[in-house]
Regions:
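Active-site proximal loops enriched in glycine and acidic residues that flank catalytic Cys/His/Asp
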Residues: 366, 386-388, 425-428, 470-472, ...
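Secreted/periplasmic carbohydrate-active enzymes, especially glycoside hydrolases
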Residues: 1-2, 6, 17-364, 573, ...
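Active-site mouth of glycoside hydrolases
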Residues: 119-123, 132, 142-146, 152-160, ...
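Substrate-binding clefts and catalytic carboxylate motifs of secreted carbohydrate-active enzymes
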Residues: 24-27, 32-42, 167, 174-181, ...
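N-terminal signal peptide c-region/cleavage motif recognized by signal peptidases
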Residues: 13-15
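Short, solvent-exposed loop/turn segments at secondary-structure junctions
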Residues: 97-98, 140, 431, 475-476, ...
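Alpha-helical structural signal in soluble globular domains
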Residues: 290-292, 376-382, 414, 455-463, ...
Length: 732
């Protein structure tokens, strides 16, 4: 039976489709048909729909209910009247994971590789009144013995290998729950004589912050030369203000099979700037590029952007946005390993929690997300460190390096209009920088993926409007207290200006945990990682070795105590680390990113928010430690001894662009019910500063924990920031 998508019912009454007064676009979302495509002899572009099943588009096939590895054929039909002679028909895919082989009416149209890119296909010559569209989508299972995980061949980052996805990073099940599919919108676009495939926007600050120029590049296709006028308009999107517009007469050259580019510049004197959260309003402009001839509109493309200047100052002096220094209080973020499940509303929910935690930035860790993420961050003023989707090891060939560099350029071109993206980050923990891999992989060598890293970094560096971080090095991952060392190490001087990972695991609340671990595996007989009941826990990302051996945690006698112990440890660690590195602001620390913000599936990992979006104790600890104005407490040592004197240093750290005069710092130190120390001191707090205010000599009496409280009061006596710390005391 024919299944027809009605693109525009009003048009079906016409014998031909007249050239539209404006470009038109129709979504092809809905119930498509799908069939296993792993048999290479099966030609899914033809034949009947017998034995095909319904599958929703857009969706990752796993989230749509089909747990599948490898290839699927997708098919749908749609109808429309025969277009007019000068009409260009474009099929646009916003994201197909991972390989796409596209057929229309029995003819192969194009192949594409890459899960996150929008790609356009000219189908003008093959479009008819009744059309059958077929797509073979292949998200390959990579052989664990020869390819995965050290020599991966897909640029998918955390989507096909990571500690936080089903099965974990290194187990044979680490590729479970494949993310493949037509996961982002598909549409048919009709234009006249020319098609605009992309509008690339970048700010030019050569005339100063008060006289920005918007540089615009159109990526277009035209079968013949076109005499046209390009009108570029930048109108306020989320505020009321000046609208900027300019017309550019031009002759667009015929492109053939390769899209071409044309560049123009729009002066925007006194334009409103995009500011990050805590520093101002994130002004956004809706930019429209319209091509016209004497008969009307040929094509139009819109994109939203904001004007902001980002600079990484030398010598660890910090990052500036629009000339103002900004200290980065960040967190690593993955919304879901199945990107189609993350809607604008869900990103807004997550980012509200991020902001309430007092973070001003996220690191989109090891993947490119769906476009709603960047739209939400743009609107909220939430800064983004955007990684390329390269996690650990890959094919070391020149061909793969070229492929990864190409995809990195496409990321920059397609997502670079978002002002929230302030950093392009390269490969995460590349093998040449990960000597620990030598013990795990016999074929590891000290230069593995060094060329890949450099080619990707060079591709990212072509964007001169952002900070580029060539790769996320293991030296920037401060895992003391979890993978090595102790909490005490977190109080030591930092060795890098940028800290892109720190944290610890914690169990979620009991009601959430019950949805993750089967009842039969609820309580393993021992804490030894070889106990078979830990297998289910490890599949859901829990790390018994790090929990019980490295961190030295106890389960206690109940699940309630187990949850409490892990959450308390995570809370202590993230707060201790965050405060320590904030006290080291610009000496040398300029940016820090806790790992991770949220658990992405029914998992037990490093998230301070569980997969049901219920905060753990670590969330509230980080919320205190990330206060823009922070009365920080430095215990000097994490464990004290009874009856031995120690020192507590009280600091004020102010990330805000404004200071506070006439303030007071007040404190008290208690042990049990006894007050050991109390006082206050007048302070003037400079903007963008961090200073040690007072050192307190304290001698604990017995082994009860010390409770330290510190708060900042304004000139009216109102508490504007407060903090607390528990210090464990050991017997002498």
């Amino acid at each position: 039976m024919k299944r027809l998508i009605l693109l525009a019912s009003a048009l079906l009454a016409l014998p031909v489709l007249a050239a539209p007064p404006v470009p038109v676009s129709w979504s092809l979302a809905g119930q498509w048909r799908a069939h296993d495509g792993n048999d290479p002899a099966f030609e899914g572009w033809r034949g009947t729909d017998t034995h095909w099943r319904k599958l929703r588009v857009p969706a990752n096939w796993y989230s749509a209910g089909w747990d599948h590895q490898g290839a699927l054929w997708y098919r749908t039909e749609f109808s429309l009247p025969q277009p007019a002679a000068d009409t260009l028909a474009t099929l646009e895919f916003d994201g197909v994971d991972y390989f796409a082989d596209v057929w229309l009416n029995g003819k192969r149209q194009a192949k594409h590789e890459g899960y996150f890119q929008r790609f356009a296909i000219d189908i003008t010559g093959d479009l008819t009144r009744y059309n059958r569209l077929a797509v073979r989508v292949d998200s390959p299972f990579e052989d664990p013995k020869t390819i995965w995980p050290l020599h991966k061949k897909q640029v998918k980052g955390i989507l096909n290998q990571h500690d936080s996805r089903p099965g974990g990073a290194w187990s044979p099940q680490g590729q479970d729950a494949n993310s493949g599919g037509i996961w982002a919108p598909v549409r048919l676009r009709l234009s006249r004589a020319v098609a605009i495939d992309n509008l690339i926007l970048r700010p030019d600050w050569s005339q100063g912050l008060d006289k920005p120029t918007l540089s615009a590049e159109l990526v277009y296709r035209a079968p013949a030369d076109v005499q046209t006028t390009l009108t570029l308009t930048a109108a306020p999107d989320n505020f009321t203000g000046t609208r900027y517009q300019q017309a550019f007469p031009m002759n667009l050259k015929a492109t053939g099979d390769t899209p071409q580019r044309v560049a123009v510049s729009l002066p925007m004197p006194d334009a409103k700037l995009w500011w990050p959260v805590g520093y101002g309003f994130p002004h956004l402009y809706q930019v429209t590029a319209t091509l016209r001839d004497d008969a009307g509109v040929l094509d139009r493309r819109r994109s939203r952007t904001g004007l902001r200047q980002v600079i990484e100052q030398p010598d660890n002096k910090g990052w500036t946005v629009n000339g103002t220094r900004v200290f980065i209080r960040g967190t690593n973020y993955i919304g879901s390993p199945w990107l189609s499940t993350m809607t604008a509303r869900r990103y807004a929910r997550d980012f509200a929690l991020v902001e309430e935690m007092n973070a001003n930035a996220i690191r989109v860790h090891g993947h490119v997300a769906n476009r709603s993420l960047y739209q939400q961050a743009d609107e909220r003023g939430l800064m983004i460190w955007q990684d390329v989707p390269l996690q650990w090891g890959y094919d070391d060939s020149d061909a793969f390096a070229d492929n990864a560099a190409r995809q990195s350029r496409e990321m920059v071109a397609q997502f670079g209009n978002s002002p929230s993206i302030v950093v392009w980050g390269g490969q995460n923990e590349p093998p040449f920088n990960s000597p620990w891999m030598e013990k795990r992989f016999p074929d590891w060598h000290k230069d593995l993926n060094r060329v890949l890293m450099q080619r990707v970094a060079d591709a990212l560096a072509e964007d001169k409007t952002r900070i580029v971080h060539a790769y996320s090095a293991v030296e920037e991952h401060y895992w003391a207290g979890w993978y090595f060392g102790t909490l005490q190490n977190l109080l030591e001087p930092a060795k890098t200006a940028i800290i892109t990972e720190f944290g610890a695991q914690a169990l979620p609340k009991l009601s959430t945990l019950k949805t993750i671990i089967p009842r039969k595996d609820w309580w393993p007989a021992s804490t030894e990682p070889g106990d078979p009941k830990w297998t289910s826990w490890k599949y859901h990302n829990f790390q018994p070795i790090q929990t019980f051996k490295n961190a030295g945690l106890s389960r206690g006698n109940s699940m309630a105590s187990f949850i409490h112990n892990t959450q308390q440890y995570q809370a202590d660690l993230v707060a201790l680390a965050a405060e320590s590195y904030r006290r080291q602001r610009y000496q040398p620390v300029t940016a820090l990113f806790q790992f991770m913000f949220v658990e992405t599936w029914p998992s037990i990992n490093w998230g301070v928010v569980d997969y049901l979006r219920q905060p753990k104790a670590g969330y509230y600890a980080l919320q205190r430690a990330y206060q823009p104005l922070l009365p920080s407490i430095d215990p000097v040592n994490v464990q004290w001894k009874a009856d031995q004197p120690g020192q507590i240093h009280l600091w004020i750290v102010n990330d805000q662009p404004s200071g506070l005069s006439g303030a007071r710092l007040a404190w008290r130190v208690k042990q049990g019910g006894k007050l050991l120390e109390q006082g206050e001191q007048p302070v003037t707090i400079p903007a963008d500063s961090g200073n040690k205010i007072v050192s307190l000599p304290v001698t604990p009496e017995g082994t009860q924990p010390l409770q330290v409280e510190s708060r900042i009061l304004d000139a009216a006596g109102k508490t504007v920031a407060d903090n607390r710390l528990r210090i464990d005391v050991l017997p002498r």
